[in-house]
Amino acid sequence: MDSTPLAQPLVVDTDNKTPKHDLENGASTADTIEEHPAKKPRLENAPVTEKEEADAAPKRVKGIAPVKAEFIVQKSARPQPVEADNTVDADDAAEAASHQQRESEQKGKKKTSGQNKGRDFGQHNDAKGLCPSRAFSPEFSPKECKFGDRCRFEHDVRTYLKEHKRADLTTFGGICPLWEAKGRCPYGYKCRFVGSHMTERETADGRKELVLVEDETRKKAQPLVPHASEDGIVNAVSMEDKVAVARRKIKTPRSDAYLTWLDKTSKALEKNLHGRHFDDDAEGEVGADVKVSLEDVRAAYVEPPFLPSEKRRLYFGPETPALAPLTTQGNLPFRRLCTDLGAQFTYSEMAMGMSLIQGQKSEWALMKAHETEAIPPTISSGANIVQGYDNSQDLKFGAQIAANKPWHAIKATELLGRLTPHLRVIDLNCGCPIDQVYRDGAGSALLDHQSKLEKILRGMNAVSEAIPITVKIRTGTRDASPNALKLIERLTLGGHESSMLNIGPPGVAAITLHGRTRQQRYTKQADWSYIAECAALIKRLNEKTDEVTDTVREPDARTLPNGGKVYFLGNGDCYSHKDYEDHINNAGVDAVMVGRGAIIKPWVFEEIQTGQYLDKTATERLAYVEKFAKYGLDTWGSDEHGVGTTRRFMLEWLSFTQRYVPIGLLDYLPPNIQDRPPAWRGRNELETLLGSPNYKDWIKITEMFLGPAHKDFKFEPKHKSNAYEPQG
């Protein structure tokens, strides 16, 4: 897309050289300084031609944000130390930060640069906790503590408030956001805003008793959806169920039956198609001159124990931008903020299938969604909707899992369908580039094992009940050999084995393609021309599904998602409504999934909705940070631990938002997410603060809403050069 100049031509130096500026954030000056030939002086009052005006306008340089000259900060002529560009590390980690390899450092040496692998955020708890038996009871009539004198927690409420708990926060007007929204605070005396919902009352004997206050009117507010909890959360798995999963008390009969069939079928195929023989005591061996006819293969085929259940029909369209699954950044408060701003579909952070099967609390917690994610998406009245789609039964939130073995993915899918039924889709991650995930055989490693991937998706589709199955892939693992076209054809029609057995496609309802290889990571721009090729292929395959079907044995309708239509989404570098419209119109995708662009500026969904650039003021942007703080306290709690957790995730987010250069400061639009700006200042102090790459400024921003950091709080961002520890 052509870049459009926004301002009057900048005045060049008298020596006809482009002004030189030191660059920040890893932007190189190697390709930015160029010598211009001397121009003929123009006669006074001579008309300015379009060519002269274009020549005089500042040139857009690839990789460098075109900040207007008046906002560029001139550095001193003395050589400045160069900061390492840590954005690629951070962007990679946004895909699977919690699953990276924890490499041990050499003894006696502590690295001060590079990625933080095993990240430590310190402690943020009360000096001495309040006993749960006292947390919600009136001061003089507490519940009985089963530990009695052996209890290690404080039993005197006034002593706890005076000596062990930090002073109340004064932000948000000193009013607890949870109490203000719901009429009660689930953290009682431990709340950092307890003064707003606690009072003293006089008892019959004249003593003053501390009691908690509730607002009965606010408590009567009903959830948006009937299956949400009182706190507005859906898909909250009980502790009893997590323990039952961990102890294998919750059975997965469909998965067990399907996996038994899959194992037998796979061995039969290996024997008949490739001459490999399996027995209990020996490895498979290749037989000589094995030739089996198609009829013999189909005769040996055993039907699966059951067919997939009929799936809910899906819809993806130009009016339904999706927020990509994002590890760490894709937490519930951030998804909730993006939903407010127009995101129509959201996904959980990537959960590991094996961890779900083992009942790990942290992994099952990723399935929680806010009630605003459990309402139907907004779609156009003139949308081209597949037959049978019911918008009233649709919702916005889906789960994403990763697995390296079929049984991991299939069992996890059955458990998700049983314990968290309010999911739009279950998406299989086949794009994660992180080394540890790749080496384990999950994520993008599955791109090179397409037969295995097809088995996984077919099995997931078989056991997911009514929940559709989708998949997210990359263009390939290596730059020299992209294989997404071949894979997409296989996922749409079925591979060689399924063709031989005439069992139809694996049942994928939608495919999302990230336009980069694993090898590229985020070092290059997404390849939307390749995405367009894949979109054209999907369109042809959707049109010809009936033609390639064996008319002798028509597949059951339950094996065909959306009546045979596979949706196709593109992903990569969408940073404005112009990018979105270009991808919809020129790449031919059904919808676009937005990842980093939404982290850096979540109002990109609002731009897509309104079809225009939105030059948000610093005050408006700070209001989004405030909203995130409220949503964070609502999610993680308003006690000391919850405030610390909210601060940690807010800092993670601010490490991305500081990359945003306001569009009012740019010479050219549209902005490019890959561009790195020179040192710049904002239109006011707050705008400059929000764009600061200094972690100390990020801490200041969190303190505007969460008060001073706990004395034991640490912040270890994705890159070690930005680490923070309390001083003193």
Curated annotation (Swiss-Prot):
Pfam family, one: Dus
Sample GO molecular function, one term: mRNA dihydrouridine synthase activity
Compositionally biased intervals (Basic and acidic residues): 14-24, 33-58, 117-127
Residues the record marks as active site: C432
Cofactors named for this entry: FMN
EC number(s) from the headed UniProt entry: 1.3.1.89, 1.3.1.-
Keyword Repeat: yes
GO terms of biological process kind: mRNA processing
GO cellular component, one term: cytoplasm
Annotated InterPro entries: Aldolase_TIM, DUS-like_FMN-bd, tRNA_hU_synthase_CS, Znf_CCCH
Record's keyword terms, sorted: Cytoplasm, Flavoprotein, FMN, Metal-binding, mRNA processing, NAD, NADP, Nucleus, Oxidoreductase, Repeat, tRNA processing, Zinc, Zinc-finger
Residue intervals of every C3H1-type zinc finger in the record: 125-158, 175-200
Chief subcellular location: cytoplasm
CDD domains, sorted: DUS_like_FMN
Region (Disordered): 1-133
Annotated catalysed reactions: 5,6-dihydrouridine(47) in tRNA + NAD(+) = uridine(47) in tRNA + NADH + H(+); 5,6-dihydrouridine(47) in tRNA + NADP(+) = uridine(47) in tRNA + NADPH + H(+); a 5,6-dihydrouridine in mRNA + NAD(+) = a uridine in mRNA + NADH + H(+); a 5,6-dihydrouridine in mRNA + NADP(+) = a uridine in mRNA + NADPH + H(+)
Cellular compartment(s): Cytoplasm; Nucleus
Positions annotated to bind FMN: P325, L326, T327, Q400, K472, H514, N571, G572, D573, G595, R596
UniProt family annotation: Belongs to the Dus family. Dus3 subfamily.
Summary of the function given for this chain in its UniProt record: Catalyzes the synthesis of dihydrouridine, a modified base found in the D-loop of most tRNAs. Specifically modifies U47 in cytoplasmic tRNAs. Catalyzes the synthesis of dihydrouridine in some mRNAs, thereby affecting their translation.
Protein name per the record: tRNA-dihydrouridine(47) synthase [NAD(P)(+)]
Organism listed in the record: Aspergillus clavatus (strain ATCC 1007 / CBS 513.65 / DSM 816 / NCTC 3887 / NRRL 1 / QM 1276 / 107)
Lineage: Eukaryota, Fungi, Dikarya, Ascomycota, Pezizomycotina
Name of the coding gene: dus3
